[in-house]
Structure formats: C-alpha cells, structure tokens
Amino acid sequence: MSKMPLLNARELAKILKKLGFELKRQEGSHMFFEHTDGRTTVVPNHPSEDIDRGLLNKLVKQDLKMERERFLRSL
C-alpha cells in the first residue's frame, strides 16, 4: 500500500475539482467543497503548509467516501 503524498491545499483543490467537487465557499483559512451527490469536505488553506497525511486519509475515507487506492490513481 502506497503512502499518501504530501499535498498542499491548492493541489488538493485541483484533485477535488477533477473528482467532481465544487468550491462552494471559503471562510477564513478553510475551503468548503461539495459534490453533486451531496458529499462535502472542508480543506484547510494554509499556503505555506502541506496537509497532514492523517487529515488527508480522514478526508479521503470519511468525507470523500473513497478507497485510498482510487484516490491515489486520481493524482
């Protein structure tokens, strides 16, 4: 099983858009994305920092409701 890559908020936002998510709003340092099927996720937007692998795993599994390998193939 591959390790989750280190991604920053901009890179993750591009991947989410590719997967069909749309940026609905941004409040402070958090971006709120929504999919047409109702799935939602919030991504912290700190430009100089990568998103922690633990948080990225949580987003993929719980928010995106995707298998980790499917997410990695979408990179």
Language-model-detected regions and their locations in the chain:
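N-terminal first-folded block
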Residues: 1-27
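N-terminal, well-ordered alpha-helical segments
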Residues: 14, 41, 57-58
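C-terminal structural segments of small proteins and small subunits
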Residues: 48-75
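A short, structured beta-strand/loop element
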Residues: 25-54
